[in-house]
């Protein structure tokens, strides 16, 4: 790996270092991470899974993602909001997910809060994309040093505070920034990564919600 954080894959392509040449992580890096998302279900899924990741690695969550989807009705927040204590018990007994009561209860709570956000803003996408940082808030160069030095940003702090004020849980500034990176509100593919210009083109073409 170079000092910039770029590694060359077996296919000769330059990529961000963090995929570590693990096949499932590499697919996630190449096909999902950073590509702009405006679908409410995917946005809700991601912010919930980032909450489950707290204290763990994203790879652990990624490898259990289909199990999470099965346990939480595909992260349809209208359905998850109706979960009761029986559903909590079912999830706690599900070895395919992270069996953390606080995070399970948080997901149900956040589903109810997501409905409130949708009622107020028309969609989760409209709420979150309002916070897309302007060019003047972004670094001139996105390299490994920048990523390490900025696990959270002023924008993610603002979003975190607003969500918490609205009753959301497990949405700290670092969790929120990881969500922003993954959902394409920022392009944090490193300079030199083959995905960076692809993501930038998608962001340019995107019709903001």
Residue ranges and their predicted role:
Residues 1-209:
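HhH-family (HhH-GPD) DNA N-glycosylase catalytic core used in base-excision repair
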């Amino acid at each position: 790996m170079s000092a910039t954080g770029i590694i060359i894959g077996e296919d000769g392509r330059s990529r961000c270092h963090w995929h570590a040449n693990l096949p499932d992580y590499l697919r996630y890096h190449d096909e999902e991470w950073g590509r702009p998302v405006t679908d409410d279900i995917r946005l809700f899924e991601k912010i919930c899974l980032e909450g489950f990741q707290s204290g763990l690695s994203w790879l652990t969550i990624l490898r259990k993602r289909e199990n999470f989807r099965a346990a939480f009705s595909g992260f349809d927040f209208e359905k998850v909001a109706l979960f009761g204590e029986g559903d909590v018990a079912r999830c706690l007994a599900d070895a395919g997910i992270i069996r953390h009561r606080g995070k399970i209860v948080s997901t149900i709570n956040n589903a109810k809060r997501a409905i409130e956000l949708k009622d107020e803003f028309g969609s989760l996408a409209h709420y979150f994309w309002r916070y897309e940082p302007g060019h003047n808030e972004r670094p001139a160069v996105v390299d490994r040093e920048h990523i390490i030095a900025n696990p959270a940003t002023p924008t993610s702090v603002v979003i975190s505070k607003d969500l918490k004020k609205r009753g959301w849980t497990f949405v700290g500034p670092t969790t929120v920034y990881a969500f922003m990176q993954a959902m394409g509100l920022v392009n944090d593919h490193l300079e030199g990564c083959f995905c960076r210009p692809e993501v930038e083109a998608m962001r340019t073409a995107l019709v903001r919600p």
